[in-house]
């Protein structure tokens, strides 16, 4: 699937960045909604 045989570093960083932003967004949204404090 990958021509180089491995995942490009920029793609790993991009996915990691999106994942981190999503997790932080869900965490702050949960805390704002009042369900984050119960977890």
UniProtKB/Swiss-Prot annotation:
GO CC aspect terms: photosystem II reaction center; plasma membrane-derived thylakoid membrane
Recorded topology in the membrane: Single-pass membrane protein
InterPro entries reported in the protein's UniProt record: PSII_PsbJ (IPR002682), PSII_PsbJ_sf (IPR037267)
Disulfide bonds: none
Signal peptide limits: none
Record has NAD as a keyword: no
Name of the protein in its database record: Photosystem II reaction center protein J
Natural source organism: Crocosphaera subtropica (strain ATCC 51142 / BH68)
């Amino acid at each position: 699937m990958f021509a180089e045989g491995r995942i490009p570093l920029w793609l790993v960083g991009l996915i990691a960045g999106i994942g981190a932003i999503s997790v932080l967004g869900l965490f702050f949204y949960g805390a704002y909604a009042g369900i984050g404090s119960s977890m």
